[in-house]
Amino acid sequence: MYIKTFPKIIRRPAVLEITGWSKSTLYNRIHDGLFPSSINLGARAVGFVEGECNNVIQAMIAGYSEQQLKSLVKDIVTNRSVKG
């Protein structure tokens, strides 16, 4: 039997806790293309795809340069789609 798993969505406080960043640092990194942007969950709610965040954090740990991080984030955001 095949069980379909869905990406886990985490809210901003969880991202801040995981990264240790301030809100302004998080949004500056998103603006600079160094961290994946949030997704809309509703009219007034947004969240972050946990797997995307983890991929970028792992790349930071691995010592990716700023340019490599930008490329990774661009690929992550570009590849967002509904997979059936």
Predicted regions, residues:
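Polyanion-binding surface elements
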Residues: 1-28, 52-63
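Major-groove DNA-recognition helix of helix-turn-helix-type DNA-binding domains
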Residues: 18-47, 70-81
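A short, Lys/Arg-enriched interface patch at domain edges and termini
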Residues: 54-84
